């Protein structure tokens, strides 16, 4: 079959190929015009990526996660927890890159994190939110339409695959191992329950794909002293009890990058970990792109409705 295929190609290309010069040039011009308009349509909507921010290595991992997207759209990152200063800088940067509108993708574990503050800053909410906030919310100077993503990494089934890979890569004898997935966790009890429920849903993939003794999820409630102390005691007791039963606990952090404070929390206890968060992993990039595309569609729909209302 392969030799017949090669023969047919040889016969075809051994014949003279005669194309009138006018047709050839017209084809080239059409191709260039088409590719130019495609690039233009790709780059009209900028991607403003919000991320927590941390060490140079932490920030570098986020930068790397969007490196492959920069060829398709203007990209700017606003580090900080809904910090109006970095949001304004990133917005201005996108406009300087030629963005005519902006899709804001929030690279947070929970979709609830800083959602109200961000919506207020981008003039999508009329009133400033009250309560826990690292930065005083303020309205940004907007000169282009903006749309905001609502979901977080906890809502993405793609993250389940990352958790499965982390567990399998760390496993030696799964029947004698228990998985413990630990997240940052919020202060509000009801919101924390939502975190745990979503983490447990993603952890189901490990239960299905692995043969571990148990798969467990919990949060540390890191920024709330009283609640953190109770969580630490519970987590440490679990690791200690599993060791006493002859099982090894594999700790997987459900955080964007790194191991956070867990080395300190579990100091002196026997466990296994590689300290990898969700990054680096191409599936986070896939999630960012999908959030960008859905937020971009919201922008296009909104602009279409605005045009129709003015007709």
Label every model-predicted segment.
Residues 39-311:
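Active-site-proximal alpha-helix that buttresses catalytic centers in soluble enzyme cores
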Residues 23-33:
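Bacterial N-terminal signal peptides
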């Amino acid at each position: 079959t392969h030799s017949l295929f090669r023969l047919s190609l040889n016969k075809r290309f051994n014949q003279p190929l005669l194309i009138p010069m006018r047709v050839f040039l017209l084809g080239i011009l059409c191709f260039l015009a088409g590719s130019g308009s495609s690039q233009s349509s790709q780059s009209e909507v900028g991607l403003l990526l919000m991320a927590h921010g941390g060490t140079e290595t932490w920030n570098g991992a986020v930068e790397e996660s969007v490196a492959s997207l920069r060829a398709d759209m203007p990209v700017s990152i606003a580090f900080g927890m809904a910090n109006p200063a970095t949001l304004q800088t990133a917005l201005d940067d996108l406009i300087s890159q030629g963005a005519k509108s902006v899709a804001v993708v929030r690279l947070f574990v929970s979709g609830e994190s800083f959602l109200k503050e961000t919506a207020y800053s981008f003039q999508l909410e009329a009133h400033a939110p009250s309560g826990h906030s690292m930065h005083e919310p303020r309205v940004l100077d907007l000169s282009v339409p903006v749309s905001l993503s609502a979901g977080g990494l906890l809502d993405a089934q793609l993250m389940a695959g990352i958790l499965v890979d982390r567990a399998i890569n760390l496993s030696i004898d799964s029947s004698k191992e228990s998985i413990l997935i630990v997240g940052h966790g919020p202060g509000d009890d009801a919101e924390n329950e939502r975190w745990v429920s979503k983490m447990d849903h993603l952890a189901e993939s490990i239960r299905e794909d692995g043969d571990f003794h148990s798969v467990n999820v919990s949060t540390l409630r890191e920024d709330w002293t009283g609640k953190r102390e109770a969580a630490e005691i519970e987590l440490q007791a679990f690791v200690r009890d599993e060791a006493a039963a002859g099982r090894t606990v594999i700790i997987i952090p459900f955080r964007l990058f790194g191991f956070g404070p867990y080395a300190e929390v579990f100091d002196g206890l026997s466990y296994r970990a590689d300290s990898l968060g969700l990054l680096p992993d191409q599936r986070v990039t896939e999630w960012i792109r999908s959030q960008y595309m859905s937020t971009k569609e919201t922008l296009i729909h909104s602009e279409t409705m605005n045009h129709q209302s003015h007709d």
